[in-house]
Amino acid sequence: MNITTLTLLVLTPFLVWRIYSRLRTAMARQRSIVSRHWTGLLVFAAMVLVPASELLRRLDMLGWLALGTAAGLGYGVWAFQHTRLEATAEGYYFTPPARLGIAIAMLFTARILYIGFEMYANQGSNVPTPRFTDSLLTMLAVGLTGGYFGTISAGLAAWRYKIRQAIG
């Protein structure tokens, strides 16, 4: 083991802790901003559609991506039903269920970190770096994350649209 590997092993827990603390604050009560909801919907839809376009000829991996997306959509619908929506004099606010959102985001983060470690471990060797779409666990994590957060974003955008229609 060289010094770079040791540094990587020591810094990884700090990175994970920092990501977790950022997610915890992101899952607290937030002001509802319509443009962010639409941006979230587009980003998370692209997060699923871009790998799907790569996997059109590999139906097995496309199936894993679809399974992850379906699970993410299901969890997203359940989570949106448990999201606290508030219309106050100061503005519109929402509070998503923190535990599920943090768990899904940390699962995705763990998968990305694993890919990074794999690339680091294989550098300088003759082992080819696998493509992002070669792992069924990665496709499950991408689908789950994109489906979940895309559904939450779509639900929030629809909520704000209904409020706007009710106001006139």
Predicted regions and their residues:
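Structural signature of hydrophobic alpha-helical transmembrane segments
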Residues: 1-14, 62-72
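Helix-coil boundary and interhelical linker segments in multi-pass alpha-helical membrane proteins
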Residues: 1-5, 51-63, 132
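C-terminal ends of transmembrane helices
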Residues: 16-30, 79-90, 154-161
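A generic, lipid-embedded transmembrane alpha helix
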Residues: 37-56, 107
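Alpha-helical transmembrane-segment detector that highlights a single hydrophobic TM helix
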Residues: 57-83, 95-96
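C-terminal halves and exits of single transmembrane alpha-helices
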Residues: 73-89, 101-118
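C-terminal membrane-adjacent module
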Residues: 103-168
